[in-house]
Curated annotation (Swiss-Prot):
Belongs to the bacterial ribosomal protein bL21 family. This is Large ribosomal subunit protein bL21. HAMAP family: Ribosomal_bL21. It comes from the Bacteria. Keywords: Ribonucleoprotein, Ribosomal protein, RNA-binding, rRNA-binding. The gene is rplU. It comes from Prochlorococcus marinus (strain MIT 9303). Disulfide bonds: none annotated. One of its GO terms (biological process) is translation. Residues 1-22 are annotated as: Disordered. The lineage of its organism: Bacteria, Bacillati, Cyanobacteriota, Cyanophyceae, Synechococcales. This protein binds to 23S rRNA in the presence of protein L20. The keyword Cell membrane does not apply.
Length: 133
């Protein structure tokens, strides 16, 4: 039987580095909700008062985990931690239908709305000025 060639060390190191970056995340508080943010991914938040292509910094970081199994939990916030976001687009969410009906009566009310959202891309997660990603 032929033996399989050994994996290249450069490829293994690059794969491990990519895994480290994908394992880093931050949990932040924005617009009254908590969001799990990872670098180089986009998320839809409630409408932010920022123009497209602006950079927004979130300081209310509740938890940071880097790819090296180091987790920092804030009480309530992590000191010196921030998440930098880039505003990609302002959009509207899907239509939500609210239907209220009273049984055995002729009372029916149908309302609906679309939530105003801002799509942001996570640029970097940093703690004490040092970027994790």
């Amino acid at each position: 039987m032929a033996e399989k060639p050994a994996a290249k060390p450069k490829a293994a190191a690059a794969k491990a580095e990519a895994k480290d970056q994908s394992d880093s995340y931050a949990i932040v508080e924005a617009s009254g909700q908590q969001f799990w943010l990872q670098p180089n991914r986009y998320y839809d938040l409630d409408r932010l008062q920022a123009a497209v292509d602006d950079t927004v910094t979130l300081e209310n970081v509740l938890l940071i985990k880097d790819g090296k199994n180091d987790t920092t939990v804030g009480q309530p916030y992590v000191k010196g931690a921030s998440v930098e976001l880039k505003v990609m687009d302002h959009r509207r969410g899907p239509k939500i239908i609210v239907y209220k009906m009273r049984p055995k009566k002729k009372t029916r009310r149908k309302n609906g709305h679309r939530q105003e959202l801002t799509r942001v891309m996570v640029q970097s997660i940093s703690i004490d000025g040092k970027a994790l990603s």
